[in-house]
Amino acid sequence: KERGDVIIATKDTHEESYLETQEGVNLPFIHCVQNTEGWQLDDAVQAAMPENATIVHKPTFGSTDLVKIIGEYVAQYGETNVHMEIVGLCTDICVVSNALIEKAFYPEMPITLDAKCCAGVTPATHDAAIATMRMCQINVINAD
């Protein structure tokens, strides 16, 4: 926020029928149902975001809308001149999905993951996701 960076937040957004989806069957934990308390951003996170931050609602692990938004910056500034830094939850589900989607669409765009600003479902799956991202040329910082 203080550096004037563009801030884009993805936000899990599910419907009441979440448990009937493939994700809901395999991850039977109702979460982020639109317009519920659990769907809202944490107050501290909201306070840290600038007023002009973009919030992308995503019903899946990775966001195709995020790809389009990043694509606008890539078109304007060039792939190597756009740098993405990723933080968030869950490292082993949504974070790794978004990182790899962006890397697939923009292989020359530098992507950094700040591991201290992420958390996985378990410490082991968090570490596995970090290892996966490193193997796919995502720059991982603060992992130790």
Predicted regions: what they are:
Residues 2-6, 15-16, 21-144:
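Active-site-adjacent betaalpha module
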Residues 11:
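Catalytic-core segment of enzymes that process non-peptidic bonds
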